[in-house]
Each structure stands twice: as C-alpha cells, then as structure tokens.
Amino acid sequence: MKIVGLPTLSDNYTWVIQSENADDKRAWIVDPGESQKVIHYFEENQLQLDGILLTHHHYDHTDGIMGVMDALGEVAIVSNAQGPFKPVTHPVKEGDQVQVLNETFQVIETPGHTDEHICFYHPEALFSGDTLFTGGCGKIWQNPPEQMAESLLKLRALNDDCMVYCGHEYTYANLNFAKIAEPNTPAILDRLAEVKTNTQRNIPCVPARLGLEKQTNPFLRFDHPPLMQTLMERQAQPNESVSTLFATLRAWKDELDQTNILEAGLND
C-alpha cells in the first residue's frame, strides 16, 4: 500500500491510497476537499478511481467529490451511515470492515468534532480526519467534551507503529501549544525543533507515528499526571474526570488559537 498526500485548500490533505504494484492503477481517495489537484494527480499517474472514503461531512473534506467523479467516474462513497452527507453509497458503522485495494480497513466511530465522524484504521495507517491531528485534535462545536475525549482514548489504544494521516497540517502550532502545556517534556521540545525546521523548508509534517503522538500530543496525554496537575490548577474547582480534563485542555487551546502566539517563531 502506497499513500500519497495532496495538499488542498489552505491547510487540508486529501489522501490517495495506491498499490505498491505499478501495474495496478486502481486508487482510492480520502476526504477530497477540492477536485482539481486530485484529477491532475490521477491523470498524470494514469490512475483509475476505485472508491472514496469520507471521515465526516464538512465541506473542506467533501466539496471535491462531485468534480472528481465527473472527471474520473462514479465510484463507491464510504462513510458513516448516520451522517448527513446524502451521496454516501456504502454506509458503515463501528466495527465494519472496508476493502481498499488488497487491504482491509476497520471503521472506528469517533464522535466529537462531528456526530458522525469516523476513522479508517489499518495496522499501518490511520485516516483520522479531524479527530486526531499531528500534535493536536479537532475542535468540538456542539458535542459534549466527553465524546471527543473517549474517541481520542480509543485511538490512543491502537498500535504505536501505525502512521497517522490526518485532515490538516497544523503540526507546528499544535506543538507550540504542547510546549506550553508540558514545558519540561524533552520529546515535545525535540519534535517541535524538527517540525519547525521542516515547516520552514515546506516539508510536510504529516504523517506521523502514533507512538510519537502518544509521547508528544497533549490531547492523548490529558490523563498523564504532570499534565493533569497543570489542568486542575486551571480549573475553578479541581476535577480529574476525563471529560473535565479534556474540556479544560481544549478550552486552553481554543483561547490561544484566538491569538497569533502558536504560529509565531517560524522566521526566527
């Protein structure tokens, strides 16, 4: 299995899943937020569109679907059975399996960013959409914090060597926040230095090993004792429940997202 990332819109990724066999021209795409880059890549590489995986319904993950199929042909659209996106042809739910080329992906329901959000898991690859980012996690809008916390803990239980293919490139800002949340964690400082260099050189920071996320992503570490203590100190009434810890962490990140502090320093 070969996975290629196509940068789309301002900071999105559409993922192309291809065969390692050069004679097999079938390929799937994940979360096409726009069509032209996908069409160009398929035509340039003489690929045949075989199917589409959708993690959730937001426009920046779905707006390219019709344009892609107009150009490359209609195919199966696989997404959550409960989602509002009507063109889904193959609805799936927790525990279902999806055959992609010669590989099998497991469907994991991860509500939080949206009600119907799902991830597609293979021991080598996790398409995490806007649930788990490199160094961070997706925003929660109207859903309860405990939903997202539980979804992230489900993903944390997956194998360390799995590569995380998320929906956006937010790695530098996310790790700047991780440094603020856990300032004395060497793994975070080392990763931030590497990510800063790569970002300055326009080298993608996605994908990343899930094992590295477990070491450096505060949204997979909110129940880690030192970070727990920091979060409880930010609460009016200290509470170590998973939902409250996560909500405190997410609110802290949201607060800093309103400033430019997390994007600063790239030109230093």
Curated annotation (Swiss-Prot):
UniProt remark on cofactor binding: Binds 2 Zn(2+) ions per subunit.
Source organism superkingdom: Bacteria
Positions annotated to bind Zn(2+) 1: 56, 58, 113, 130
Biological pathway: Secondary metabolite metabolism; methylglyoxal degradation; (R)-lactate from methylglyoxal: step 2/2
GO molecular function: hydroxyacylglutathione hydrolase activity; metal ion binding
Keyword annotations from UniProtKB, A to Z: Hydrolase, Metal-binding, Zinc
Reactions catalysed: an S-(2-hydroxyacyl)glutathione + H2O = a 2-hydroxy carboxylate + glutathione + H(+)
Its EC number(s): 3.1.2.6
Protein residues bound to Zn(2+) 2: 60-61, 130, 168
GO biological process: methylglyoxal catabolic process to D-lactate via S-lactoyl-glutathione
Cofactor field: Zn(2+)
Matching InterPro entries: Clx_II_MBL, Glyoxalase_II_hydrolase, HAGH_C, Hydroxyacylglutathione_Hdrlase, Metallo-B-lactamas, RibonucZ/Hydroxyglut_hydro
NCBIfam families (UniProt xref): GSH_gloB (TIGR03413)
Family: Belongs to the metallo-beta-lactamase superfamily. Glyoxalase II family.
Primary role: Thiolesterase that catalyzes the hydrolysis of S-D-lactoyl-glutathione to form glutathione and D-lactic acid.
Subunit field text: Monomer.
Annotated protein name in UniProt: Hydroxyacylglutathione hydrolase
Species of the source: Hydrogenovibrio crunogenus (strain DSM 25203 / XCL-2)
